[in-house]
Amino acid sequence: MSNMTQLTEAQIIAIIKDWNFAWSLIFLLITIVLQYGYPSRSMTVYVFKMFVLWLLWPSSMALSIFSAVYPIDLASQIISGIVAAVSAMMWISYFVQSIRLFMRTGSWWSFNPETNCLLNVPFGGTTVVRPLVEDSTSVTAVVTNGHLKMAGMHFGACDYDRLPNEVTVAKPNVLIALKMVKRQSYGTNSGVAIYHRYKAGNYRSPPITADIELALLRA
């Protein structure tokens, strides 16, 4: 029976040839996502990266459950069951924290699997929300020719003289307020401002109005 199912060298080479091109494209895609999937580089690639990360939990659970139902041996069945349980608990924890953050900010960025920090910047009659990958006690705002970048991310058109005096960083369990402590202009409608943490509390951020998040996605 084993001789009938044993693959020959030619069959193995044929299988590798069939999958080689597909795997080369998959690894190229993974490389692009890992290298350029940052909000400061390309928001479009970053959103795709978040989608891929979001699929890892259910994929891990599905594979673990399949391995537990159709095990190789008893040891693999036990390990697969443990992995499935851990993946399920991590996924549930993620949803709990994301829902808490969504209730605090009202932004769909709350379901970002990479970070649970959201930077809320009020300007232009709205509040623009962006994921904050690095948790810090201070945030730098740079306005160049009327275009705002904070923490390396694009926020759109904004006059330097109309920069908000306060921004907030939302987490599932706390809202941190940062006040402008220093600013310096260096050209026409251009300058730098530094925001530093000065208080924190368990309350909601100001309501978001017409935050065209998806329309502001930019490379």
UniProtKB/Swiss-Prot annotation:
Q: Which domain of life is it from?
A: Viruses
Positions on the Virion surface side per record topology: 1-18, 71-78
Signal peptide (UniProt feature, chain positions): none
Q: Provide the alphabetized UniProt keywords.
A: Glycoprotein, Host Golgi apparatus, Host membrane, Host-virus interaction, Membrane, Transmembrane, Transmembrane helix, Viral envelope protein, Viral immunoevasion, Viral matrix protein, Virion
The entry lists its GO molecular-function terms as:
structural constituent of virion
* Any matching Pfam family: CoV_M
Membrane topology term: Multi-pass membrane protein
What is the similarity comment for this entry?
Belongs to the betacoronaviruses M protein family.
Q: What does this protein do?
A: Component of the viral envelope that plays a central role in virus morphogenesis and assembly via its interactions with other viral proteins.
What protein name is recorded for this chain?
Membrane protein
Species annotation: Middle East respiratory syndrome-related coronavirus (isolate United Kingdom/H123990006/2012) (MERS-CoV)
